[in-house]
Curated annotation (Swiss-Prot):
Molecular function per GO: acyltransferase activity; metal ion binding
Organism: Thauera aromatica
Protein name as annotated: Benzoylsuccinyl-CoA thiolase subunit BbsA
Catalysed conversion reaction: (S)-2-benzoylsuccinyl-CoA + CoA = benzoyl-CoA + succinyl-CoA
Family: Belongs to the BbsA family.
The EC number(s) this enzyme carries: 2.3.1.310
Record keywords: Acyltransferase, Aromatic hydrocarbons catabolism, Metal-binding, Transferase, Zinc
Pathway the protein contributes to: Xenobiotic degradation; toluene degradation
Length: 144
């Protein structure tokens, strides 16, 4: 008689969330959330996200700099076929901030409504659902 093995479910890997405290600060006092830039204490280069060591001088000490909440849409793409957990259609874009940084982010609003050079502002919202259908919250930008 052959030995029967119990049906074992494969272990579920933990889901990856897009929210990370090194990227986004939501102040407890109710002030508006902001993205965190990192300025190298050695050479002054500002980056988002944090790049360690500093790509300019190899410095390893940084200060957190709150980034502007507003910027200009440099480029964007409307997506009609998405990855698992993302409701289609949706848009992504590159946003130029006054600090001379270019940020990649999901855009909040109807695809087809965006134009290059649109003024946009930081917001927080659902970027997708995890495998369990739980919304994952992170930063996005929307037209002003």
């Amino acid at each position: 008689m052959s030995e029967q093995k119990p049906n074992k479910k494969p272990e579920k890997k933990p889901d990856i969330t897009f929210f990370h405290p090194d990227l986004l600060e939501a102040p407890a006092d109710g002030r508006a959330p902001y993205l965190k830039g990192y300025r190298c204490k050695k050479c002054g280069q500002l980056d988002f996200p944090k790049l360690s060591p500093c790509p300019s001088c190899w410095g390893e000490e940084f200060e957190v700099v709150p980034l502007s909440r507003r910027g200009k849409l440099y480029s964007f793409s409307d997506n009609f076929i998405g990855q698992a957990g993302m409701k289609t259609p949706y848009s992504f874009g590159y946003i130029d901030l006054p600090e001379n940084l270019r940020i990649f982010a999901q855009l909040e609003g109807a695809p087809g409504s965006f134009r290059c050079d649109d003024e946009v502002e930081l917001t927080v919202g659902t970027v997708r659902d995890n495998r369990d259908g739980v919304p994952l919250i992170s930063y996005k930008f929307r037209k002003i």
